[in-house]
Amino acid sequence: MQDLEIIKDFLRNKRGYLKKGNEACAYGLLRKTNKTFSFDLIKQAKKEVKNEIKHQQSKPLLSRDVAEDFRDHVEENRQKLENTPFAPTLQKRKEPKFAINPSIKDQVGMHILLGCNHVPFHNQRLHAGIRNLMRDYKYNIKGFHLMGDFADMNTLSSHDRKMFTAVPGLTLNMEYDACNEELDLFEQYLPDGCWKTYLYGNHEDRHNRWMKNMDNAKTPLLSPMDGMLLEERGYQVKNKWSQDFFTLGTNFQIFHGVYFSIHNAKAHLDKLRTSCAYVHTHRIQNYREGTMSAFNIGGCADYDSAAFNYASRPMKAQWANGFAINMIDEQGRSNLTQIYVNPDGTFWFGGRLY
């Protein structure tokens, strides 16, 4: 049972995988050990490791009662609790680390720009096509940029306050599990050293707004950054959705989106006076003045899903699926291609239908 012990050691050291699906665990093991393992063996290992952790937490104390022991070892016990998947509400919210952009020479190549995926309400056909494109261009990719609302955070939605979620029974942990699976699937086609960024959108900001309530903050829910293990995955994270941005090349900004007007691309360029790309509105637009351009690149969600029942028919009629590819050259100049998506989730790029 050597393979079983290998999997168990992996799960003991990376307990976040205990909350992930078997496919995500198999991919993590493949990257770590260069070996493939059956889902049945992974399932058995997860069960045994979870039982180990439960047993460790429930061992009887011989010398003093539980309350005295916890007081005597409060910091040690707090850390133990925060590192187990069975006490997610005890996690403290971390602030993202300061982000440093790669040098221009390390950015030269292809950058994938996605946003408004709204996982688990994403367009599955579109996601599959994007992964196929990434597979074909894997060694050209220098940046993978998630521009906000990758996670829908439907369980914290104000649209559903005091009501069932769009999918009855949906929990925040289930949403994070779905996000982790999608991230695993995308990341298998990213080369080592790829620059990965994650911007919060107004949907991830639902967690920030939730935590501003004093009663909620007493038993905090996992943040998107923690629930998706973003920093552990190597993403540079920014969590102030209406303020934050990343700069690609010399001066091309990417952010979630600020303005929601009919001609929002012009509004962004008028106010920011720099070339940029954003999502947020679920629309596709572009506006150019001289050497500056603003691109609203659409979204990657399934707009027919129950999560968008709040939107009126005229509002949905303006929405479009899309994403973008930005080629950075040696001078740091951006050359952006907007990808328009067909109603069935397919799209064309490089003379091929994905």
Question: What positions do the PLM features span?
Answer:
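Conserved beta-sheet core of the metallophosphoesterase superfamily
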Residues: 251-350
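Short, amphipathic alpha-helical "recognition" segments used to contact nucleic acids or chromatin
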Residues: 1-20
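Short, basic interhelical loop/turn and adjoining N-cap
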Residues: 18, 27-51
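Metallo-beta-lactamase
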Residues: 218-251
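Core catalytic region of metal-dependent phosphoesterases/phosphodiesterases
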Residues: 98-99, 114, 119-231
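Structural motif
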Residues: 109-111, 142-145, 252-253, 275-277
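Flexible, charged surface loops at secondary-structure boundaries
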Residues: 104-107, 135-140, 190-192, 230, ...
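Basic, amphipathic N-terminal segments that precede the first structured/catalytic domain
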Residues: 43-139, 246, 352-354
